[in-house]
Amino acid sequence: MSSEEKKNEQTSETMEPPKSVSGIIKHLGPGIIIAGSIVGSGELVATTLAGAQAGFILLWLIIIGCIIKVFVQVEFGRHTMIWSKTPMKALNDVPGPKVKNGANWILWFWLVMTCLVVVQQGGILGAIGEACTMVQPLTEQGDVYNKEMSTKINAIIKTAQDPSVAEVNKDALNLNPDKPKDIKLWAIGIALLSSALLFYGKFGLIQWVSTVLVFGFTVITIINLAMLQTKPEWAISFADLKRGLSFGLPESIGGVSSLHAAMAAFGIIGVGAAELIQYPYWCLEKGYSKFTGKRDDSSGWKSRAKGWIRILKIDAWTSMCVYTFSTIAFYLLGATVLGRIKLMPEQNNLVRTLGEMYVPVFGDWAQEIFVFGAFAVLYSTFFLAAAGMSRVVADGFGLFGFLKNDEENRMKWSRIISGIWPLMALGLFLFLNKAPSTMILWSGITQVMMLPILGVAALYFRYKCTDVEELQPTKAWDVFLWISVSGMFAIGFWTAYDKLFG
């Protein structure tokens, strides 16, 4: 084979980046998967409760929290594009303590975080089981449970609206039905289905599922907000939005300081630690790095790299728009539906409470629509996080020496682990028998504490690894990157302090 033939063979998979709108849209995808995995337990539960607690006044912070982490996300993607290196291998190159020929300090913290992410997945699976039981109980016990919980939550709502009826509703308020086996049966069925889909499915299927689910919960969210606008007592006014965008802080929330409330809200939204690591893997599978080609510092390679990094940025910012819209919507639902009557339901009853509040105004069909939207949100997180984490775990295990550390083996074990992951989550849900919100919280704490570490890595990638001048970001981008990292440090250290000494 001649040298020219070898060169052509090496570059046969490269592709010039698209410039037309249709071409760009065709090559988007990784960000939609990330959007689907983000808008789950955090946005549905924590953001809605934050809106209920603070009212409209923290809306500005919710928006900033969604936007600001994208700069770190893009730096992770940029590094992968330049060096064709997976994120875990890149993180293992960050200076610091390291086991000889093995994993460094970042990967050890990641290992702890990942163990708790599986627990979180178990909690989300339980929440999905509860949502399914609401609309389709499988046993008579489930039907009775739904009726008793409906009676109890309606009593809670009426008492919140008019405390004088508390005595009349005493019996209903004291109802405490045992959870039916329907929840576990639904969880088992969903875990088995997800395991099969993930094991046999490839990137195309995962992207398709994420697109359908993201589209589903986005449409449902629009419907929910539109219905609220038809009722004067629930409608969101211009004054409400103006207050939410005034950069103010609440005086106190149930005795909690405004700083505490603001930091808590900032920490639960936008791209989390797990998603920051997962994103470049989806970029690799979409082909961004392959289309760019192996680095040779030629003018052609630099041109392709610059163009595909542009596509990556568009993808990241598009996904940000999707999950920011959904996050804002859930925050407004909390501020409007719960905040105005000062009702703070238990996290495990949040979906049921919101669904019940729609019934007197819009009828039973409104509850079913809301619960379907909640299911789409929760299942997208469960399914897509399992798909993403399997790729990260396979790569990480190779660096720890548990698996052979090469690309072929990584891809093979990614598929195997993706099939096992939902079953592990199911086992933890059934074995631990904890409330879903408790299981979700455990993982959330470690992910927030991981953010400063990833901030350090992003700065290392930017200033030590982005050595091609044509591919370096602008000065303005660098400013926002530092702001992003500063925010991640603030929330990470605040969370550690709050949990240890708060």
Question: Across the structure, where does each feature detected by a protein language model lie?
Answer:
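Membrane-interface "cap" regions at the ends of multi-pass membrane proteins
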Residues: 1-43, 104, 306-318
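Hydrophobic transmembrane alpha-helices that form the core helical bundles
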Residues: 102-175, 378-398, 436, 489
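Membrane-water interface regions at transmembrane-helix termini and the short interhelical loops
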Residues: 130, 170-175, 190-213, 219, ...
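Transmembrane alpha-helical segments of multi-pass small-molecule transport proteins
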Residues: 137-199, 215-222, 411-427, 451-460
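C-terminal membrane-solvent junction of multi-pass transporters and transport-like membrane proteins
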Residues: 203, 209-212, 395, 401, ...
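Hydrophobic alpha-helical segments and their helix-loop junctions in multi-pass secondary transporters
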Residues: 215-257, 262, 272-281, 454-468, ...
